[in-house]
Design a protein with these regions (language model features):
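Oligomerization/assembly interface segments of phage tail-like spikes and tubes
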Residues: 67-82, 117-130
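"Short basic amphipathic alpha-helical interaction patches in structured regions
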Residues: 64-65, 89-94
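Hydrophobic beta-strand residues in large extracellular and virion-surface proteins
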Residues: 12, 16-20, 31-33, 48-50, ...
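Compositionally biased, intrinsically disordered low-complexity segments enriched in polar/Pro/Gly
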Residues: 1-7, 61, 66-68, 106-109, ...
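Short, surface-exposed loop and linker segments with low hydrophobicity and enrichment for Pro/Ser/Thr
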Residues: 41-43, 64-70, 111-116
Length: 134
């Protein structure tokens, strides 16, 4: 029973992934949204990789056996071939998604290497155990 009380913290990454995938696929035709940083076969462009790079516990009570809230940090990496404006448009959609869910967005970086453009940023917020992102 105690394990079930805190399982939401481990499921949260998948919840955000599913919501982001639906949102991005409605905004950008043909985008691949994934949690896996490795894939077999030919690369697909554009691709959005979402990874939860950690979380800290927040809102501890005196007994400390139940996780009341967490502050997860997600790193979003978008890759695309083509014009800089296109990857910026895709990044703006992704940032808009996170802002609509009350995340703080930081560390936006744009790079290019061998004709592949990359946009990376992080998103973080405190989320309570009984909050609903949808």
């Amino acid at each position: 029973m105690e394990n079930e009380l805190n399982s939401w913290t481990l499921d949260f990454e998948d919840t955000v992934y599913r919501l982001l995938k639906v949102y991005m696929e409605s905004k950008e035709s043909g985008i691949k949204v994934t949690q896996d940083d490795e894939s077999n076969g030919t690369p697909v462009f554009p691709t959005l990789l979402i990874q939860q790079i950690g979380f800290t516990e927040a809102g501890r009570d005196t007994e400390s056996y139940f996780i009341n809230a967490i502050r997860p940090t997600f790193q979003i990496t978008i890759t695309n071939k083509g014009k800089r404006e296109k990857i910026k448009d895709i990044a703006e959609y992704a940032v808009s998604f996170f802002k609509s869910k009350n995340f703080d967005v930081s560390n936006a970086v744009f790079t290019v290497s061998k004709q592949v453009r990359t946009a990376t940023f992080r998103a973080s917020r405190i989320i309570g155990a009984y909050e609903n992102l949808a």
